[in-house]
Amino acid sequence: MISSFHRPTVARVNLQAIKENVASVQKHIPLGVKTYAVVKADAYGHGAVQVSKALLPQVDGYCVSNLDEALQLRQAGIDKEILILGVLLPNELKLAITRQVTVTVASLEWLAMAKQEWPDLKGLKVHIKIDSGMGRIGLRSVTEVDNLIAGLKSMGADVEGIFTHFATADEADDTKFNQQLQFFKKLIAGLEDKPRLVHASNSATSIWHSDTIFNAVRLGIVSYGLNPSGSDLSLPFPLQEALSLESSLVHVKMISAGDTVGYGATYTAKKSEYVGTVPIGYADGWTRNMQGFSVLVDGQFCEIIGRVSMDQLTIRLSKAYPLGTKVTLIGSNQQKNISTTDIANYRNTINYEVLCLLSDRIPRIY
């Protein structure tokens, strides 16, 4: 999907806010802890290359989801460590070794496949993934991990790190969190050959469980100024939301009582009113179910009426505003604000998803 530069819909990304958010977390966690910036999914929709370059002086490395995301950073000149958090199958290892990308290994089956596909792992840096209770990828026993580490080292790999991921670090009830933490600690303590880096802290753990940090953290959503819990838990320090989303009115008209708006005729005017059309829709990540939510025009909340279309939405206006009038979908407009979390709550989802759904059809302005 190409970016649409010839329409007024844009996302503005404040890189300075991202840098300050990361600095706030770094002040909150123990000294000497390594920081990895999580820039997967195009830095949660903010632009992985631009964010990575902005954070280059502040962080020790980056986390991505897959090899393609890692290669994008390498091609952009990012030379610090890049860890792939997902599983890279052994047939892609040559490229990972050549471009000095650190991979996650999560099973003995992977090791067996590597012996067949690419038995010489010299130059490969590895982090071992532990499933402490998330139920996704990872090993579950000390014996498995010991065997995996020994096998990887025998093939020439540098087993630099070991890590896990918490399922409920952003919830008030820490029962599950503590179960996972104790599982991970016990496993680490039982290893014959412990890797140099041990990390379990995502954004939520770094904020609300900073006393449980090992020697590295992975900062994702908090870097972009959002509360990992949505609004369930209070933040110990302020954050700046880094992305705003805006457009403009491209059509304004008066409709009469009884007129309908949008697909399915789901909105019927009860009286004569002004309506405005805004060029953003579900193809941009502004989902179809946003009817009834509001955007900001001239410091006023204006309701979205009718279903959101692929490329457009329609709002009720208090008067006939001129074409080109600014419309704020995320961010501030004359002392009023719409946050990403507000949108997530309306959609019954999480703020992460709202950002990640913003398509690359929307240009990012830095």
Swiss-Prot record:
<dbReference type="GO" id="GO:0030170">
    <property type="term" value="F:pyridoxal phosphate binding"/>
</dbReference>
<dbReference type="GO" id="GO:0005829">
    <property type="term" value="C:cytosol"/>
</dbReference>
<dbReference type="InterPro" id="IPR011079">
    <property type="entry name" value="Ala_racemase_C"/>
</dbReference>
<feature type="binding site">
    <location>
        <position position="310"/>
    </location>
    <ligand>
        <name>substrate</name>
    </ligand>
</feature>
<dbReference type="GO" id="GO:0008784">
    <property type="term" value="F:alanine racemase activity"/>
</dbReference>
<dbReference type="InterPro" id="IPR001608">
    <property type="entry name" value="Ala_racemase_N"/>
</dbReference>
<feature type="active site" description="Proton acceptor; specific for D-alanine">
    <location>
        <position position="40"/>
    </location>
</feature>
<keyword id="KW-0413">Isomerase</keyword>
<dbReference type="InterPro" id="IPR000821">
    <property type="entry name" value="Ala_racemase"/>
</dbReference>
<feature type="modified residue" description="N6-(pyridoxal phosphate)lysine">
    <location>
        <position position="40"/>
    </location>
</feature>
<dbReference type="Pfam" id="PF01168">
    <property type="entry name" value="Ala_racemase_N"/>
</dbReference>
<comment type="similarity">
    <text>Belongs to the alanine racemase family.</text>
</comment>
<dbReference type="Pfam" id="PF00842">
    <property type="entry name" value="Ala_racemase_C"/>
</dbReference>
<dbReference type="InterPro" id="IPR009006">
    <property type="entry name" value="Ala_racemase/Decarboxylase_C"/>
</dbReference>
<feature type="binding site">
    <location>
        <position position="136"/>
    </location>
    <ligand>
        <name>substrate</name>
    </ligand>
</feature>
<dbReference type="GO" id="GO:0030632">
    <property type="term" value="P:D-alanine biosynthetic process"/>
</dbReference>
<dbReference type="InterPro" id="IPR020622">
    <property type="entry name" value="Ala_racemase_pyridoxalP-BS"/>
</dbReference>
<dbReference type="InterPro" id="IPR029066">
    <property type="entry name" value="PLP-binding_barrel"/>
</dbReference>
<dbReference type="GO" id="GO:0009252">
    <property type="term" value="P:peptidoglycan biosynthetic process"/>
</dbReference>
<feature type="active site" description="Proton acceptor; specific for L-alanine">
    <location>
        <position position="263"/>
    </location>
</feature>
<comment type="pathway">
    <text>Amino-acid biosynthesis; D-alanine biosynthesis; D-alanine from L-alanine: step 1/1.</text>
</comment>
<keyword id="KW-0663">Pyridoxal phosphate</keyword>
<comment type="function">
    <text>Catalyzes the interconversion of L-alanine and D-alanine. May also act on other amino acids.</text>
</comment>
<protein>
    <recommendedName>
        <fullName>Alanine racemase</fullName>
        <ecNumber>5.1.1.1</ecNumber>
    </recommendedName>
</protein>
